[in-house]
Amino acid sequence: MKSCHNFAKRQRALGLGVLGWHSLLQSKNIAFEGLEAQFLNAEIHNIIRERCDRATSKLAEEFGEPEHLRGYGKRNMTTMAIAPTTSSSFILGQVSPSIEPLNSNYFTKDLAKGKFTYKNPHLEQLLEEKGKNNTTTWKSILVKGGSVQHLDFLSEHEKDVFKTFGEISQKEIVIQAAQRQKYIDQGQSLNVMISPKCPPKQVSELLIFGWEQGVKSFYYQRSANPSQELARSILNCSSCEG
C-alpha cells in the first residue's frame, strides 16, 4: 500500500477514457467503416486531449505540481487511457462498450437477478420508422446472431451502420485505434474478433500492421459469432479502398 500511495502522490496519474463509440456513430447514421467515422474519431480525441492538457495545467496552478512533474506545469503524469468499460457501458444507458463495436443488435444477457434482453435502440427506432418493428423481424435478427444483413428492406448504408463486431473489418478497428493513439498518453483496450478459420498469416499481418501504425498493444482476440456472416478478410477496410 505504501508504494501505491507514493506512486499516486508523486505522479497523480489519471486515465480518462470513452464509452459508447459505436452507439454514437449509429445515432448519427454513420457506418463504423469509412472516412466519416475516422474524422469524428480524430475530432473527439483531439478535443479530449486539449481539454485534459488545459485541466491538468489549471490544477497545477491551484494545487501545485507533484514531485515527478516539477517544472512541467502539470498536475498529472498521465491523463488518458481507453478502458474496457463493459459494465459501465451497460449501466450508463446500455451503450456499446468503450471503442468496441457491438457484438450483436439483439441478445439475452444473464444477470444476477435474471435474464435481460437487449435490443439496439437505434436499430429499433429505424425499424419503427419502416413499420418493421415487430416480433417476426426481431426473431430473424436473433436467429442470425444479432445481424441485420439479411433484412431486404434495409438499404446498403443502413446495413453498414448496423454491422456487428464480426462483420466489420478488423483492420478498420486497428486504423481507428492508431488514429486516436497519438492523442492518448497511455494504452487502449483494443479487442479484435477473428474467426478460428482465419489463416494465422493474416492474424500476424494485422498485429504487425497495428504496431507499424503506432498501436501500443492489443487486448483480447475474440472468436467470431458463427451465426453471422463474417467480413471477407480481416485485412480489408472500406476507407482503404479507392
Residue ranges and their predicted role:
Residues 23-26, 30, 46-65, 104, ...:
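Generic secondary-structure signature for well-ordered alpha-helical cores
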Residues 1-9, 13, 25-85, 156-159:
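Internal maturation/activation junctions in enzymes
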Residues 13-31, 202-215:
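Hydrophobic/aromatic-rich, well-ordered segments within soluble, folded domains that form packed cores
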Residues 10-25, 169-183:
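Structured alpha-helical segments in the cores of large, soluble enzyme domains
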Residues 20-32, 99, 148-154:
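Short, compositionally biased low-complexity segments
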Residues 80-231, 235-242:
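Catalytic alpha/beta core of large soluble enzyme barrels
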